[in-house]
From Swiss-Prot:
PANTHER family associated with the record: SPLICING FACTOR 45, SPLICING FACTOR 45 SPF45
Annotated source species: Mus musculus (Mouse)
Protein's cellular compartments: Nucleus
GO biological process: alternative mRNA splicing, via spliceosome; mRNA cis splicing, via spliceosome; RNA splicing, via transesterification reactions
Name recorded for this polypeptide: Splicing factor 45
Gene3D superfamilies xrefs: 3.30.70.330
Amino acid sequence: MSLYDDLGVETSDSKTEGWSKNFKLLQSQLQVKKAALTQAKSQRTKQSTVLAPVIDLKRGGSSDDRQIADTPPHVAAGLKDPVPSGFSAGEVLIPLADEYDPMFPNDYEKVVKRQREERQRQRELERQKEIEEREKRRKDRHEASGFSRRPDPDSDEDEDYERERRKRSMGGAAIAPPTSLVEKDKELPRDFPYEEDSRPRSQSSKAAIPPPVYEEPDRPRSPTGPSNSFLANMGGTVAHKIMQKYGFREGQGLGKHEQGLSTALSVEKTSKRGGKIIVGDATEKGEAQDASKKSDSNPLTEILKCPTKVVLLRNMVGAGEVDEDLEVETKEECEKYGKVGKCVIFEIPGAPDDEAVRIFLEFERVESAIKAVVDLNGRYFGGRVVKACFYNLDKFRVLDLAEQV
């Protein structure tokens, strides 16, 4: 028997009416939500043509699946199959493969290095192009490039030509005459006046036979020339024999009245495979003129008696050939002798072509100026022979540049 058995307990549904209404409302809401979920699921199953979404397994997909598996069925269904509001139901979101990840290394350093190398390569190409353009302008202005003891073109051919000329002048081995000349020599009559002279005295002798002496003092003769030069130009005893058969005697000209050549012709080389024939007398005259010119010019010992810091270069370019690059190129070329303080180009109007343009170089040391004069005097520049000497330092500083040297 309980404590309150004697009390009457009224049982009525009015006190529980509010709770039952709320419960019924909850049940109705759950049913509506369940119906919406089932309807959406049925629509997705009908769209069989849509591809399944791609899942990136490397990005912790297992933890997401495990989380979804632990959730209730209706919540898991909502998480697995969300329908975005901004996309249609048929679109599928695929994550990008190259999505930026700050923890993952990239190619930034390689790209920067490649761009730096490309810029450096472009600068090198531009510098090389500028050098080539400068060399091209220099070659267009001068026939020979830079300072040189002799012109650059055909230097190898000139050396070969000089070597062959020295061999001929040394009187080397004689070339055997053709058999036709030997047979004619044997068939000559006994009374032929030059038969004995045409035959060599000995087989081992390579020098030419001296001409016969005649006892005719009144006979006019041309002045005798140097014997060694003729024999060297004639190429030895064979050519001498052939000329003697036609009546040639040393010091006399060919022909009946001796008006022909008294010395052999020679060839002067003009190009790689070309040349011109010059008379031996003209060659000897030209050599004599060259020797006289060399003797007239001031020797280097006279130039070096009064050295200064200023060097004067003449005959580098002719009148009207001065351009804007000449000063820079000359200064750069002379930097190898020592530091050049100043380079001045002065042109004298009305002067001869080899004296019109003067180039002054002021070195910081006298030793550098002496090196420049010794090395540059007599060199070729653009087909011209450079004249180098010293100039008064005081007159150079007051710009008195037209003094006679």
